[in-house]
From Swiss-Prot:
Family: Belongs to the arminin family.
Keywords annotated in UniProt: Amidation, Antibiotic, Antimicrobial, Immunity, Innate immunity, Membrane, Secreted, Signal, Target cell membrane, Target membrane
Function, as annotated: Antimicrobial peptide with a broad-spectrum antimicrobial activity. Keeps its antibacterial activity under a wide range of salt concentrations that mimic physiological conditions of human blood, which is surprising, since Hydra is an obligate freshwater animal with nearly no salt tolerance. Does not affect red blood cells.
Main location: secreted
Signal peptide from the UniProt entry: 1-18
Protein name: Arminin 6494
Taxonomic path: Eukaryota, Metazoa, Cnidaria, Hydrozoa, Hydroidolina
Positions of the propeptide removed during maturation: 19-57
A single cellular component GO annotation: extracellular region
Length: 85
C-alpha cells in the first residue's frame, strides 16, 4: 500500500511542477518502471534465499545413492581388518 501512495504522491508532484502533459507522462512512466524493478529485485533476492535453503541438503544426497545391500556383507570384514592393528 505504501508503494501506491508513493507513486500517487510522485505523480502529484510531477503534475504540479510539469511544463506539459508529455513531461508528466514520462515522469510517471519512469517512476512506475523504477518501482517495478525494485520489486523484482526484492523478489529475486527472496528466491535466491529459498534456493540456498533447498540446496543445503544436497551434499548428503550421495549417501542415498550408495547401494547399501551390496555393501553390508563387507562391513564385518572391514571391522575385523580394522581391529587387527
Amino acid at each position: 500500500m505504501k508503494t501506491v501512495f508513493a507513486i500517487l504522491f510522485l505523480a502529484f508532484i510531477a503534475l504540479t511542477y510539469a511544463r506539459s502533459y508529455e513531461d508528466v507522462k514520462e515522469e510517471i512512466k519512469n517512476e512506475v518502471e523504477k518501482e517495478i524493478l525494485e520489486d523484482l529485485e526484492e523478489e529475486s533476492d527472496e528466491l535466491n534465499d529459498k534456493r540456498k535453503e533447498i540446496n543445503d541438503a544436497k551434499p548428503w544426497r550421495w549417501v542415498r545413492r550408495i547401494r547399501w545391500k551390496k555393501l553390508i556383507p563387507y562391513i564385518p570384514v572391514v571391522v575385523a581388518a580394522a581391529g587387527k592393528k
